[in-house]
Amino acid sequence: MVHARRTSLAPLLSGVTALLLATATAQGNNVPAQAQVINQKSFNVLGDVPPPTVANYSTLFIPPGTTKDSLFEKPFHIYDEEFLDIIGANPTLTLLKSSGTNPMFHEAAVWVPSTDDVFFVQNAGDPAAGTGLNRSAIIQRISLSQVTADVSAERNATGKVDVHVVVATPAIINPNGATNYRNRILFAGEGQGSRVAPALYVMSQNAPYNATVILDNYFGRQFNSINDVAINPRTGDIYFTDTTYGYVQDFRPENVIQKQVWRFNETSGAVAVAADGFNMPNGITFSPDGHHAYVTDTGVIQGFFGRNSSFPSSIYRYDVEEDGTFSNRKTFAFIATGVPDGVHVDTKGNLYAGCGDGVHVYNPSGKLLGKIWIGSTVANFQFAGKGRMVILAETELYYATLKAEGAFPGQLY
């Protein structure tokens, strides 16, 4: 939808909030025009806490003294002063496109530096999209050359950036995750029915978008529905998550193999398990130095089977050993609104996660620094070099400017 003009509501500044603002001002970091401080202490005690039927993973939390409109009016939410260095002096958020009820802006966000294009895909398995079993989700792209300074200065710039459908040859079936890889785009395909196996595909970055399958089995066995993919910056090995969202969204068979994280070396052909013990392994990324891996578990969402709030909505951090295996699992963060889907890091090692109300930002220790608040689900997003980010909010496509820089521009191995 196209957002109506929002009326600003001044935040209630007291206690920790006032102290945070005073500290920021003393350091010369005034709160930017599109940012606001959120005082977590102000809602430590609510008095009347809603029952789980009212407040759960699927509901937005509106802090006391704010409204949904005021939260969106100033969408860069500061939970810790470190966030000021991430967003910079003048962060902006711009709506580029809206698709009604069809979730056209879902995942697989990839920025190609040589063309300044950003690729992304439609949601596979969503009833509103009609994709999954009978029709594959599609790949699309935009050119950031169309996002001029005048466009990014607007809050609503719908109609000013063109979205193009990308037709790969042969077709990439139900693409979901993606990353740059060896001057190509590496896609995770979820498969379709029992005969079209989930697979890893590589596609050229330019037309005619030739595609090749590089992996579609483990010793003759299909994967469940490959969800996301990342490259270890130390070794160039491919890591991918395999989960059962294809099954719980009715376009893949029931569990065919354990849900886990896999490691693949395209040069040697070796495929091995990197980690297991998940309910629904989903997003994956690495720290800038490749010594740590982050994996999300979105088990609380079970597709057409509903939800189970006792299942994970968590981000886990691992050490990555010299041999590429994962060890020392640590619970890095738990998400209250929605689930942590796509994850990425900046050059300083801060972790960004697409969640149920926007993009959450954590420092390397797991402290919540701030949010880019959309007010709806962000399945994924991607840095486009320094100071730019494209955000996929299912039926809405956003462009943000900030100070931070993505850790793996191009990520060409």
Regions found by a protein language model. Give the residues of each.
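Fungal secretory targeting signals
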Residues: 1-27
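Short, conserved, GDST-rich strand-edge loop motifs in beta-rich repeat architectures
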Residues: 62-65, 120-134, 187-193, 239-256, ...
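Blade-loop segments of beta-propeller domains
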Residues: 100, 124-191, 213-218
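Beta-rich, blade/repeat-based domains predominating
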Residues: 100-115, 169-193, 218-238, 245-246, ...
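Short loop/turn segments immediately following beta-strands, especially the blade-tip
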Residues: 142-152, 203-207, 317-324, 402-410
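Blade-level signature of beta-propeller repeat domains, shared across WD40, Kelch, NHL, RCC1
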Residues: 380-413
